[in-house]
Design a protein with these regions (language model features):
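Short cysteine clusters
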Residues: 78
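Rhodanese-like catalytic fold shared by cysteine-dependent sulfurtransferases
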Residues: 1-30, 38-73, 82-120
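Conserved beta/loop motifs at nucleotide-recognition and modification sites
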Residues: 33
């Protein structure tokens, strides 16, 4: 992607900011994968995010295979960004190429007043 300010983050993934993510979604059909536990995910997540808790990620890689074959960017998020970095390392180890993490996680997203979906 052509964003000058994307930086290398933990887990060997590039980081995108909360303000860059909507652009990555609209221009490259990026998929957001939230690696929080289900209860935390239900309290708030990025619109249309897929929930695969970090503990289950290795066993659920098949769910993401269709995005790898379509060469879609995968953006990993969690509350602060720490679990997303660990998830990025798992995806990179399994040869996913377009792996990004949301810098600052959902906390940074909310700080920018971007929309959050909640499930009751």
């Amino acid at each position: 992607i052509g964003f000058d300010s994307i930086r290398r983050g933990g887990g060997g993934a590039n980081q995108v900011s909360a303000l860059q993510l909507p652009q990555l979604i609209s221009q490259e059909n990026a998929v957001v994968v939230d690696v929080c536990e289900a209860e935390e995910f239900n309290r708030g997540h990025i619109l249309n995010a897929i929930n695969i808790p970090l503990k289950q990620l290795q066993d659920q890689l098949g769910q993401l295979e269709k995005f790898r074959t379509k060469d879609k960017p995968i953006v990993l998020s969690c509350r602060s960004g720490q679990r997303a970095n660990r998830a990025a390392a798992i995806l990179r180890k399994n040869e996913f190429k377009k792996v990004f993490t949301l810098s600052g996680g959902l906390t940074a997203w909310e700080k920018e007043n971007l929309p959050v979906e909640r499930k009751s």
